[in-house]
Amino acid sequence: MKSDASTSAAPLKGLVGPLRSSEPALALPAVSPAVHLLEEASDLLVVHLDFHAALETCERAWQSLAEEPVSGTIVEVKCSLCVVGIQALAEMDRWREALSWVLRYYQVPEKLPPKVLELCILLYSKMKEPGAVLDVASAWLQDPDNQGLPDYGSLARLHVFRLLLPSGRLSEAEELAVRSAAFSEEQRVEALQAIHLARQQHTQEHTQEHSDSQEPQKLRQEGSFSQKLLSLLMLLRRLWGSVVSHLLSQPFRKGLLAALILCLLILRFDPAAPSSLPFLYQLTQLFRRIQKATLSRLYPLALRD
């Protein structure tokens, strides 16, 4: 994660330009202690790469600014201190603390300087957590005092492309692109096209998830049908085995012989009649087969000998 934070901080440094002691960024009175602390913090960040010391120096500068009267110079110093502090936190892989650290001094999101808010949006969107700064950016854009600032349009576009679209807030992105005067006609068309593509992609992903969830259900249904069919076949096999064993049992054969004798007695069948010879011959052969099958099961070794 350290490498990710380092790479995330590298492009962010170009937003306001590197702060070096040899190149004073602001024309500030030499008597202001916050100026010296700002220069010291920028040296620690850029030259010495001592990020922890740079962050502590920024915090000391903020404490000294509490006694300074509010002026345009102080506003610029506060903004520069926030930039240095955010970059130091990102380099230490503590980028998640950047927004809360800034709000500790500005109290409310609407009072954030545009450059500081832009830096936070780029940082959190690059680290794949746009939702962390989404509410802060929305509150800043809805404030009437901020809508007349020169940087309002660029922040509105960043809000759409870097925060709302990755977070899936397509309706809010569309409403902002259509109603906001910060978008030119070309920028509005570009934003609406991006929203349309994101909506199509979201629909495709939802359809794919639905089909993926239906697939296990189909497999379960097919498995249940196969299990029922297998159970039915096993039941039929057991029934068939029971019928066969019943037919081959000794009591059944005795009952069949008794029924045959009873039938002969009832029909008064004459065994001495010439017409009965074929029937008697077939009956004798049947009895011999039954006897042979019975004896072969009882005395298999004797029959082989």
UniProtKB/Swiss-Prot annotation:
Its GO biological process annotations read: protein import into peroxisome matrix; protein import into peroxisome membrane; protein to membrane docking
Give the molecular function GO annotations: ATPase binding; protein-containing complex binding; protein-membrane adaptor activity
Cytoplasmic face of the membrane: 1-246
Q: Which residues cross the membrane?
A: 247-267
Q: Where in the cell is it found?
A: Peroxisome membrane
Q: Which GO terms describe its cellular component?
A: peroxisomal membrane
Keyword Transmembrane helix assigned: yes
On the Peroxisomal matrix side, which residues? Answer: 268-305
Q: What keywords tag this UniProt record?
A: Membrane, Peroxisome, Protein transport, Signal-anchor, Transmembrane, Transmembrane helix, Transport
UniProt-listed Pfam families? Pex26
Provide the topology term for how it sits in the membrane: Single-pass type II membrane protein
Function of the molecule: Peroxisomal docking factor that anchors PEX1 and PEX6 to peroxisome membranes. PEX26 is therefore required for the formation of the PEX1-PEX6 AAA ATPase complex, a complex that mediates the extraction of the PEX5 receptor from peroxisomal membrane.
UniProt similarity note: Belongs to the peroxin-26 family.
- Share what the entry says about its subunit structure, partners included: Interacts (via its cytoplasmic domain) with PEX6; interaction is direct and is ATP-dependent. Interacts with PEX1; interaction is indirect and is mediated via interaction with PEX6.
Q: What is the designated name of this protein?
A: Peroxisome assembly protein 26
